[in-house]
Structures are given as C-alpha cells and as structure tokens.
C-alpha cells in the first residue's frame, strides 16, 4: 500500500509539473454492487495512468486498486507500475518498467514484483515489440516473454495481437496466452473488442458507447468465457453516460452475469477522466494482460 500511495503522488506531481509534455492521462473511480442469491458484494475500483515526454525520453506511471467487500470481509488488490522509454533512430524505442502486485485477502497479504525490458519498432503504420519480464522468486514463475504486432489504421483506430509465454519455476509446465484487440476511439462512438486464449480457456469481450448528443450517450458491454468449449460465464450490460466537461464524464451501467445457471445482477456507477490513452507501442506486457483480460472476462467495473 505504501508503494501505491507513493507512486500515485509521483504521477500526480509529474503530470502537473510537465503538463506541457503530457502525452496522455486518464483515470476512473467506480463503485459496483453485485447481488446473487441474496449475497451482496461491493466493489470499489480506482485506476489512474499518465505519461509524458521529455525529448526522446518518455516516462509513465499506472495505478490500479480494487477492493471487494464480501459480506464484511475485504479483499484488496493493487497494481503499481513505473517505467521509462527511449526513442531512437526515428522508428525504434526501448523501455524498462517495474510493476508490483499486492493482495490482501482475509488478513493474509502477498506481493509479486515484475521487472520488464522491451524493444520495439514503429513506422507509423506497423509496429512490433518484443519483451522479457523477470518475476521475483517464489512467485510460481521465472519469466514472462511477449511479442506484440500492431496495425494503426488511423489516429482513432488500431488493432493488435500478442503472444505471451509464462515460464514456470522449478521445471513446472509453461503456459501460453494470446491476446487480440481492436480499438476505435472516435467523437461519436468508441468500441473495444478483446479476445484472450490460454490453453483450454477462451474469452471475448465487447465494450462500446455512442454519443446521442454532445452531453448524453448510451453504453453497453458483452463478455463470454469458455473452458474446454463449455460456456461458463456470460455477461451483458447496458447503461448511459453524461459528459460533465471535456474529458470528464459519469457512467452508469446495469448488468447481469450468468455462470453455470446462477445469475448475478449488478450496477456500476463511475467517474471517468480521459485525456488520451497509452499507445499500443508503449504498452507493456502487464498493460496488455490487465486490460484485455479484465474486459474479455467482463471485469470492467
């Protein structure tokens, strides 16, 4: 938790001091209530990220915090990332980042540290990035390897695919995971489609919104998860948003999750701040795993 607070403060100070060099900044604070068979779970979610450029150097920071209130028992999850990149030769960029995962469940805490280095090529249309991440000892894995390919159709639309391999500790079985994403961020509508495959698990998620007026709009989401070709989770949601100011809006969504015949109803209310997003070129493996897995598994609180 200390690292979480320090990193949030650093990102805040940095983005204020270097506002003229800000390349992107976004944040979200949402509250979700889930009700299934009389059991209620409340979820508080916070995410903030920012990046800024200083010449050929770019710096970035990301903070994610999720709190689950399970009938009085709390489960806290946090992710903090700090990193820097260096662009050279017109088309090339190298980067290094540090990420810490922390969890505190039912009074028991644990953390995992990940250090990643990457090298990428981007000519404005096509990009490729390779990365290696070292995981701390006793995390269950030694390393995470990744290769990302991307295509930038225009300034608002991009597509990417990536392949990741998690190398297990002590001769355990390695795991492979693939991600495919399509994103469109326009003035009238936004659309995100994500697919994740990992051994016998397949998930797909669709999230979008449409602006009816300059202030009001509708939004919706779909997600499906299958294991061994058996459908184990379906999620459908619909709602709306109100644009308070440029880049700042309030979202509200009601949704239903069907898992093996058991229904869970939920409602989410959130405040979003969006001044651009991190480009695919600058996404770390952790970025891709967090965003694609959350959206495709219907965990977009």
Please annotate each region the language model reported.
Residues 28-34, 62-66, 97-101, 122, ...:
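Outer-membrane beta-barrel pore domains and translocons
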């Amino acid at each position: 938790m200390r690292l979480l607070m320090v990193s949030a403060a650093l990102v805040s100070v940095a983005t204020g001091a270097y506002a003229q060099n800000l390349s992107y900044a976004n944040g979200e604070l949402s509250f979700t209530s889930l009700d299934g068979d009389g059991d209620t779970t409340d979820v508080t979610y916070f995410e903030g990220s920012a990046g800024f450029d200083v010449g050929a150097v770019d710096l970035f920071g990301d903070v994610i915090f999720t709190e689950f209130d399970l009938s009085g028992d709390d489960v806290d999850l946090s992710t903090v990332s700090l990193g820097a990149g260096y662009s050279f030769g017109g088309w090339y960029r190298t980067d290094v980042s540090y990420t810490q995962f922390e969890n505190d469940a039912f009074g028991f805490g644990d953390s995992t540290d990940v250090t990643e280095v990457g090298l990428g090529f981007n000519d404005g249309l096509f990009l490729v990035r390779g990365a290696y991440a070292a995981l701390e000892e006793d995390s269950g894995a030694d390393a995470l390897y990744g290769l990302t390919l991307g295509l930038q159709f225009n300034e608002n639309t991009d597509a990417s695919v990536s392949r990741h391999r998690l190398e297990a500790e002590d001769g355990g079985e390695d795991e492979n995971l693939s991600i495919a994403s399509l994103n469109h961020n326009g003035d009238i509508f936004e659309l995100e489609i994500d697919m994740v495959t990992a051994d016998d698990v397949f998930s797909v998620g669709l999230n979008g919104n449409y602006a009816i007026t300059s202030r009001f709009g509708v939004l919706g989401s779909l997600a499906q998860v299958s294991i061994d070709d058996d459908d184990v989770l379906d999620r459908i949601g619909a709602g709306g948003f109100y644009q308070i100011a440029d880049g700042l809006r309030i979202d509200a969504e009601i949704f239903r999750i069907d898992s093996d015949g058991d229904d869970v109803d939920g409602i989410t209310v959130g405040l979003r701040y969006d001044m651009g997003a991190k480009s695919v070129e600058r996404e770390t493996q952790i970025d891709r795993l967090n965003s694609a897995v959350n959206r495709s598994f219907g965990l977009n609180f």
